[in-house]
Amino acid sequence: MSTSKFAALAVGLVGALATSAAHAESAGNDAEIALLKQQLHLLEQKLDKLQKQSEANAATAASAKAQAKAAETKAASVANASPAIPVKGPIPPSGVVVTMPNNRPTICTADGQNCVAVTSRIHWDVGGYDYRPDTKNTVPQRLDDGENLRRARIGVIGKFLGDWNYALIYDFGGSSDGFGGTASEAGVPVGFLPGGAVSGVENAYLSYTGFKPLGGQLAIEGGILDLPITLGEATSSNDILFMERASSQVIASTMVADDFRSAIGARWFNDVLWAGGYVTGPTTGQVHSASSTNPPGTTEQLGAAVRVAGQVLSGPGYSLHLGADASFLIDPPHNEITGAETLTLADRPELRIDPTQLISTGAIANVSSAQNYGAEIAGTYGPFFFQGEYYWFNVDRNAATGLPPIGAPRLYFDGGYAQASYVLTGETHKYNPAAAAYYGIVPANPFSLAGGGWGAWEIAGRVSTMDLNDRLGTATGIAGGRQTIYTAGLNWYVNGNIRFMLNYLHGDVPKQASATNAADVGSKFDAVALRTQVAF
């Protein structure tokens, strides 16, 4: 209450009392006048007390406001001086925001500059083979039916202060991409996953994206990465057309630039063009040791990989992608005990229910270096999608190990694939410029008995070939086999997180016993498999 209001109230009370006093005096009542004076005195005391209390409250409020303003100014000054906060300005809002983009639990600060999200994928395969060895000398004589938890990954991804990105993802799957086989000591497995490796760390990296040169986005990253060096590898396993990638692309990637790979490098991209290069080491699934027995292993390898790709044409309902890549094994793994430097090129028959590799060069001796070069093409026209890659491999065998064969000539291998799909429900594959590859399908009408949607349905076909034979008929040749596989697929995208994949494969694998022995040890097979996929 203001001083003027107190004064007005006092004047009114005094006037009223004065009137009453005059009336009492006219009546001659002295006692009543005395009582009224006493009441007036008490009211004056109360008014003085209220006025003093109001003035004190106003002073306290003004002091608190001044203190708050000073604290805000000091906090802003400290924040602006900190190197962790590059942009000067007011204090960012406090609190967190919880969201579920594509059903992925995500927590961010209110300014969106710091986030952490949980990510996971489950790929569970069941299937069987009709396997037919050409002769009794063929190895193997049968392939096992059954199931395989192909991938079972869970981890966290996020960012700090907008530009620092990270991921930590572990794979509990039964035949993960980076698992190269169980090592052993004197024929006894050395205590890790059957058919697996010493580590299931699929991603553990840090990436900086603060630089944006030439109107694009630059990512500088290092750690354990999924390297988008081939078109097939740049496509997420959640988005590939078939349960497995083509053998030619798998062999090209696993030489130096697949996932689970230790690497450091950079990639630049905009809406049209992508370019990247990395220096690479071993995968987390490899044992690198100077000893051959304790534990079994070899020294670390050194490699490098580059890729340039882009969407050269795009418009309403259509797109065309072209690209090329190259990978270099600069320093192969070296066994410090035996002196051996070897390289093996091999793959499973585009299905991993049974992990047997039907084509393999075996351990190529005296490898000093190796290279592979690839060309890629992909595109869309409405619901139609196509993709293809072809690879050429060179293996140099002039390492000075002192082991036979000495002075062996260079080896050459090659292979590729072509695949296409048609989405029966009309959706199209969208382009992902950050990886220079295509996303999978997101159904326009997710399956729902209540809502009447049936998801998205896609039919697909692929033919792939890989030739691991060279210099047959000579002592320095390699008889790794030649594999051709025809695959038909049906994909049901239930919603943005669940997919079912049905694949039928027909394979022909002609192979001879060795480079100098033409005895038939080839095989043929048919296989049917179903994948249940959950991802977020």
Could you tell me what each predicted segment is?
Residues 13, 23-123, 130-137, 209, ...:
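N-terminal periplasmic/intermembrane-space "pro-region" immediately following the signal or transit peptide
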Residues 53, 60, 67, 114-119, ...:
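Residue-level detection of beta-strand scaffold positions
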Residues 19-21:
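N-terminal signal peptide c-region/cleavage motif recognized by signal peptidases
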Residues 1-9:
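Bacterial N-terminal signal peptides that target proteins for export
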Residues 89, 100-332, 412-452, 456-473:
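Outer membrane beta-barrel
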Residues 97, 265, 376:
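Short, surface-exposed charged micro-motifs
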Residues 32, 44, 72, 202, ...:
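Acidic-residue sensor for enzyme active/binding pockets
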Residues 188-193, 208, 326, 336-536:
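Outer-membrane beta-barrel pore domains
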